[in-house]
Amino acid sequence: MFVDGDWRTAHSTTRIDLIDPATEKWIASVTDGDHRDVAMAAAAARAAASKWGRSTPAERADLLEALANAFERRQDEMACLVTAQNGSVLSRSRRTNGARPVALYRHYANVARAFRPETTDTAAGAIVRREPLGVVGVIIPWNAPQSLLANKIGPALAAGCTVVVKPAAETSLDSLLLAEMATSAGFPPGVINVVTGGRETGSAVVGCEEVDMISFTGSTPAGREIAARCGQSLTPLLAELGGKSAAVVLEDADLDVLAAKLIATCLPNTGQVCYACTRIIAPRTCFGDVVDEGCC
């Protein structure tokens, strides 16, 4: 685990083996964290939240920019590490777990620079004050872990929140590497914490009283369960669940290129992405041709 700016020995003694899906060889083992490990990480995040939340948007922007630079220097290492864990084609991993996270951290650095903690509407006699929520629990899947992680912790950090990250059990090493990068970039201890583990670890994050918000990407059934629990405690939840995206074919579409386009949109990452097209919508006037071309 990576907690409070350093590697920590977990309370849990259970380990999870990570296997390279391409070779079926053992890569490493990581802690299957329990509620005590989550509590340790959340306590560190809570302790860091006050000072981090009082930092200026410019200070947070500078650190996000530094993280982008640190990530960029090691992006190929990160891409190879993700591919070794989830089997993604390396060329794709270099985009989704290398170049894209770098761009995202730079984007959120710019968001932080433009952030205005307080605005005044003199006509309405109102003041709008934007304050960090506190500790955000982040739960991500294995298919594009670093893009998804950047899209979650980037805005949280920019807003002045601290985070407890629970990566997918299958892709744990890259999140630990990210935490190491963040420390080298200058993030204070406790701002970014990573607890590895499976379903029970994620459940502990959702149920932790020190966590003020949950950001989750994963399956629809898991999302329903998390939403129900967050509803009971009135914990804010941001959930990105399984999609049912459609490929829309218009009457003037070039059917000669349709099949290749469908493969690209329906089967990226062997179809293991939430936005993969699983439906085709076509006009009745060319429906038969679309079926014939799409099934070739």
Segments predicted by a language model, with ranges:
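Glycine-rich loop-to-alpha-helix module at the N-terminal edge of alpha/beta enzyme cores
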Residues: 25-115
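Conserved small-residue-rich beta-alpha loop and adjacent elements
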Residues: 114-189
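Periplasmic-binding protein-like
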Residues: 154, 212-217
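Short beta->alpha connector loops at strand-helix junctions that form conserved
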Residues: 161, 166-168, 196, 217, ...
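Terminal low-complexity tails and localization/encapsulation signals of metabolic enzymes
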Residues: 1-29, 62, 66, 115-139
